[in-house]
Structure formats: structure tokens, C-alpha cells
């Protein structure tokens, strides 16, 4: 089963959306497509059929995971399924919306298994959710208290390694920089 099929199965059938929500989803999709360009750390795939309600977001953001021996290793790929429900403009539940597909064993205070603890507000655009996920995976955004963390050990690790954070300082969306070089005449 492909990753996209696993996300579709976890999300369930495509809901019915009212015209306002359809327009919101369409605007979110357009905004995300406009922001993506070569050099972006995000590959986004719209998995919806009649509305852009389900996404596979694959980040090339550097983070940390555990290997098969529970040793901490660098993770350069994070994949999240994002699901928008019909009442999203009024209510947002991060555990209904976000599903971490990769890495299998993440190491972060806000991640445990497939669960992602990230504040998502009703009506928050997809681009902002992508930026927040990138900040989370790079350890720029993290839970500081073990009592509130999904992974208390990762929380303690983060506090002990503050000087090494964030792990990935690169921006999520590549930026185009146009330079024009002209010869310089010496002694003129």
C-alpha cells in the first residue's frame, strides 16, 4: 500500500463541503502552489478528489528520529497527512487533522508515533500549518515542559542541547534571488 493510500484510508471518505469551505480549500491550495518553487523544502500532494481537503506534505527538514536500535539519528524526511473537515472554519482539532506518516519513530517533544501536537486554529491557512510543521520538525518550535510533552525524554534532550537548535535553519519555501553581475573596471 502506498503512502498516499495509507493517508486516504486513515482519513476516511471525502466529506461534503459547503460553498464557503470549498472556496477556502481552493484558496489554500492556490496559495500553497504559488509558494512552492525550486529549492522549497516541501513537496505537497493534493489527495482530494472534488475538493482540496486532504494533503500529503513531505518535508525535507532536518530533524531527529530513532533507528531500529532506539539510537538517535538524523531524519531528513517528515511526511504528514493533513485533513480538513467541513467545520474547520469554526473548529480545529489537531489530532483529527494531522497524522505523522514518516519517520516511523520520531524524536521530538511534540511527536509520538503518528500523533502531532501542534496548535492549529480554526480557519488557519494551509501555508501557515506547513510553516508551523517545518518549525516543529527543525526544533525551532517545541514543548519545553515534560509534563505537557508527548515525549518527555525528547523534551529534556532539547533543553540540554539549546545551543544546537534549531537543527535546520533553512526557510521552508525557497527564495529566488536575482543577481546581475557586471564587470568592475579597475583604475578608471
Residue ranges and their predicted role:
Residues 1-77, 87-188:
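UBC/E2-like fold recognition across ubiquitin and ubiquitin-like conjugation systems
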Residues 84:
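Short beta-strand-loop-alpha-helix junction that forms the active-site gateway
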Amino acid at each position: 500500500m502506498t503512502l498516499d493510500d495509507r493517508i486516504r484510508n486513515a482519513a476516511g471518505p471525502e466529506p461534503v463541503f459547503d460553498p464557503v469551505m470549498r472556496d477556502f480549500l481552493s484558496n489554500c491550495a492556490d496559495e500553497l502552489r504559488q509558494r512552492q518553487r525550486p529549492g522549497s523544502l516541501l513537496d505537497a500532494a493534493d489527495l482530494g478528489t472534488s475538493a482540496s481537503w486532504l494533503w500529503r506534505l513531505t518535508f525535507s527538514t532536518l530533524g531527529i528520529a530513532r533507528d531500529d536500535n532506539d539510537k538517535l539519528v538524523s531524519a531528513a524526511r517528515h511526511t504528514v497527512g493533513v485533513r480538513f473537515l467541513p467545520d474547520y472554519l469554526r473548529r480545529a482539532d489537531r489530532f483529527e487533522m494531522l497524522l505523522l506518516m514518516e519517520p516511523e519513530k520520531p524524536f521530538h517533544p511534540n511527536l509520538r508515533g503518528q500523533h502531532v501536537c501542534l496548535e492549529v486554529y480554526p480557519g488557519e491557512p494551509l501555508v501557515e500549518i506547513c510553516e508551523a510543521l517545518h518549525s516543529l520538525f527543525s526544533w525551532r518550535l517545541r514543548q519545553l515542559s515534560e509534563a505537557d510533552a508527548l515525549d518527555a525524554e525528547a523534551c529534556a534532550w532539547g533543553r540540554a542541547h539549546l545551543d544546537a537548535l534549531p537543527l535546520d535553519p533553512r526557510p521552508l519555501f525557497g527564495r529566488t534571488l536575482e543577481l546581475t553581475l557586471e564587470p568592475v573596471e579597475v583604475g578608471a
